[in-house]
Amino acid sequence: TGVVDVSTTEAVDPYTGTSRYVPAQPAPLATLPQTRFLSFTHVQLASAHAKMLELSQSVPGATLSDDDQTAVATLVAALEQGTGVMPVDILGKLLRTWPLAARFPLLDLLRAAALHACTQPLTTLVSDALVGADWDGLDQASDVPSAPANAMLALRTLANGFVAPQGPATMASLALEALATLHQPPWHVLNRAGHTALATVALNYSILAVTQPTFEHAALLLDILTDVRFYPLTRQILRH
């Protein structure tokens, strides 16, 4: 009888010694631990700009001076180019003076600007986002139609901050304040997109926790990650 050569590393048929079919083996999982920050980069700048101008004409209190309009147009042009420093000062002003119902296009421009170097530090952009969304008042905002969009866009701004220039270091310095603010979020206001944005912020902070041995707020982060993981199931049970 013939002798089967077993010295080869190739898979062989034990009866004939010829190569045999071997199903493709699953590739090793390369998704965990996640080490790349996630962000929300898609934005329709022209639509956000047009909506802001429309609201300035239709919502009482959402006023734009000629200088304001010029500043916004300059910002939109810079965002379209995607290079240089974004002149965001106008957004901080309007997010503190416009009615809540008209702020969502401003927040959309802010979260787009948060991906870049800006005329204001990232810490200010984070503050502008949370103030602009009236985050502390969202628990009483279930009947405010714009609240879900405002909350979602504020969270997207925080998520985008991780990929901004010096973003990881800045978001690390804000970790205690940010995580304490996001702890026990206003779930009744967050829609699916808002839930995804919150999960992305939590994921980005978990990357910091994994990659930075000095991260000191793991317990607070774990509470948020647990809520993000289980709250949708809890909400579904409560509905039934």
Regions found by a protein language model. Give the residues of each.
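Structured C-terminal portions of repeat-based eukaryotic scaffold domains
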Residues: 193-240
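Generic low-polarity alpha-helical segments
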Residues: 1, 95, 106, 237-240
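Alpha-helical solenoid scaffolds in large eukaryotic transport, assembly, and signaling factors
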Residues: 25-175, 195, 205-206
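Short secondary-structure capping micro-motifs at structural edges
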Residues: 92-95, 182-189, 225
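Short inter-helical turns and helix N-cap capping residues of alpha-solenoid HEAT/ARM repeat scaffolds
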Residues: 98-99, 143-147, 187-191, 229-235
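Alpha-helical scaffold repeats of the Armadillo/HEAT/TPR superfamily
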Residues: 124-135, 170-183, 214-230
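Extended, low-complexity intrinsically disordered regions enriched in proline/Ser/Thr/acidic residues
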Residues: 1-20
